[in-house]
Amino acid sequence: MKRISKLATSLPFLALSIAILLSGCGTIHRVNSDYDTTIGKKWKTTNVHQDDELKGQLSRVAVLPMFKGEYDHMDLSLIEENIRLELAKLGLFEVISVDPEAMKELFAEERFSSIGVLPAQLIEKLHARYALDGLLFLDLSYFKAYQPVGIGIRAKLLNSDSGKLVWAADEIFDSSNPEVSNAARKFYKRESIIAFPLQNTKSVLHSPGRFSKYVGNSLFSAINLQKS
């Protein structure tokens, strides 16, 4: 009977403790959300070429494996995947990921640069396999894994029917640039603070993986499909 009595008296205290803990988590989340702010200009991707042919022409776009150039010795699969996922999340096209194994099977090479020599039947073979109407090349032009992290991407989108370049962007996202860090933190606050409520938005500037999500979003948000 004494054990039951002790348990009964401890239950209100336990309930109160849980309530305090839960309210504390809510407070931390609110503090991060309300007060973890950025001041100043936010970077926007502006080094962009877009042809009018892009609007309303492409619905199924294949993304080729990212050409890593001098960074080919690094495993950047997470960064590559994050950039592709950010394109898919924008809902601009149906995004088809072409894996390196498929490229090697078709062309004996896993990756091609958008500014290099391409196989003569690249578009034809990929169109036959994936029924695509657009082809996106990605080149990693700059990468810095340590603070301040940085990622440079050159992207080129071709109309697979005409072979014409319909969109291109070439940007270096350097987190030491205040405008870039502000934009990255704002993106992280909007997209990730619910999943990681205890983390300050500055953590996006310390992780190439998290930073790459911002890079993909900023880069592909520059695609304008609105008809004038």
Residue ranges and their predicted role:
Residues 12-23:
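Bacterial N-terminal signal peptides
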